[in-house]
Amino acid sequence: MKAHLDLAHDIGARNLLLVLGEYIWQKEVIPPSVQWGWAVEAVREAGDYARENGLEIVIELEPFSMSIVNTVDLMAAFIREVGHPAVFANIDVSHVVLSGAQPSELRKLKGLAHHVHFSDCDGKVHGDLPPGKGVIDFAPWLRELAALDMPGVLSIELEFCPQPDRIVEWVRDAYRETARMMAEAGLRQR
């Protein structure tokens, strides 16, 4: 992870996003509490290195049954247990929605979050659709994000574009819709 933090530092990034056990943890042979402990220890160590280099690590909730951090409660517990001044939560709105959380649950992350991924989904999988192209009602989520009074940033997260020849339009639409929603929520001037 140090090489990734070095790269983030070299390119002037603010943080490095870390996903814990998206696909690799079976929770069968090695008890989940042991896996959790290893993750806490590794993130603390990485947090030391990040802080030495003026960076932060933000942890992302993944809504998969085998993920170490797959609910808002586990996200808050993990960040608190790591207890490091350079380690925070990344709130990926579509992931939080897919985990079954309600907007009010974001309050559990007050003081613990420094970054937001903003994308939509079909309600079944996180396809990182442009905001407004899926099923999420973003207004209550934006109200809760505003109440967190986070020092971090909101970034639009887009992945697979089904029409590669329209990728520029896809990105522009995502930006326009996000700017509109944020302005309506009082989070951004038009």
What positions do the PLM features span?
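Short coil/turn segments at secondary-structure junctions
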Residues: 26-31, 59-62, 125, 129, ...
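Conserved beta-strand edge residues that scaffold enzyme active sites
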Residues: 22-23, 64-65, 159
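Histidine-acidic metal/acid-base catalytic patches
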Residues: 6, 12-14, 44, 69-88, ...
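Short beta-strand segments at enzyme active-site cores
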Residues: 13-21, 54-60, 153-156
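Surface-exposed, active-site-proximal loop segments in enzymatic domains
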Residues: 21-35, 163-170
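An active-site-proximal structural segment forming one wall of the substrate-binding cleft
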Residues: 1-15, 37-53
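Glycine-rich "substrate-gating" loop/helix at the edge of Rossmann-like oxidoreductase active sites
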Residues: 35, 65, 98
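Aromatic-lined carbohydrate-recognition surfaces of secreted/lumenal glycan-active proteins
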Residues: 55-67, 91
